[in-house]
């Protein structure tokens, strides 16, 4: 997440309601006085969310004093998420959470959230646009990337062309997504016994579009999958580095704290 985002004072937000988008994707709607003035037209952008301290269950947000960040006694748990939708008229913000149980800070909070539940937020940030203008687009991601990809598709021009590959562990996570007619969406169910990342295989088998003078791509999700996809996009499709936004959200076997620095190394690598 950019330095610009990290300079924004944390907002304290209140739970409003929640609903399932699919079997393992839960949408939580938030509001609050601190949300007033949240930037519009930032659907799909990155945000950093602060959850209650896991030991005490107390939510205390950090404060800034000059160039210093002062952390409270009950340090909150930070995680990166996506703005699914912000509605200024009702002052409501939607965040979609991947939920596989109560063991993770974000998914666990979303499952338990009820009237009176709160979280902190800074942002939004990240590149704008999230996918560069081009004649043809390639988008790929797992369930954690579906909120961002859905938001991007909603903002794309109606004449946009390309392919979208969405990887899920459970076919019941397949759901309708609004998209330009010529952006073809393909849902892929991951085989845990398959060695090669399913998204990379799908991109590799995709025929290079005829007559397209420019290509752009957006890839997000698990670390190894993002790296594999990016290599193919750079080495086989010859898409320019500045036309690819590839961001690993997570790494299998590691939590956010253990993976944070490695993520930035991966994002800065050249292929």
UniProtKB/Swiss-Prot annotation:
UniProt-annotated location(s): Cytoplasm
Enzyme class, UniProt record, top EC level: oxidoreductase
Gene Ontology MF annotations: FAD binding; ferric-chelate reductase (NADH) activity; ferric-chelate reductase (NADPH) activity
Keyword Magnesium belongs to the record: no
Keywords of the record: Cytoplasm, FAD, Flavoprotein, NAD, Oxidoreductase
FAD-binding FR-type domain residues: 8-131
Alphabetical list of InterPro entries matching this protein: FAD-bd_9_SIP (IPR013113), FAD-bd_FR_type (IPR017927), FNR_nucleotide-bd (IPR039261), Riboflavin_synthase-like_b-brl (IPR017938), SIP_C (IPR007037), SIP_fam (IPR039374)
GO cellular component: cytoplasm
Needed co-factor(s): FAD
EC number: 1.16.1.7
Family matches, as Pfam families: FAD_binding_9, SIP
GO biological-process terms attached to the record: cellular response to iron ion starvation; iron import into cell; siderophore transport; vibriobactin metabolic process
Function of the protein: Ferric-siderophore reductase involved in iron removal from the siderophores after their transport into the cell. Involved in intracellular removal of iron from iron-vibriobactin complex. Vibriobactin is an iron-chelating compound involved in the transport of iron from the bacterial environment into the cell cytoplasm. Ferric-vibriobactin reductase catalyzing the reduction of Fe(3+)-vibriobactin, a catecholate siderophore synthesized by V.cholerae.
Family note: Belongs to the SIP oxidoreductase family.
Name of the protein this chain belongs to: Ferric vibriobactin reductase ViuB
Species the sequence originates in: Vibrio cholerae serotype O1 (strain ATCC 39315 / El Tor Inaba N16961)
Lineage: Bacteria, Pseudomonadati, Pseudomonadota, Gammaproteobacteria, Vibrionales
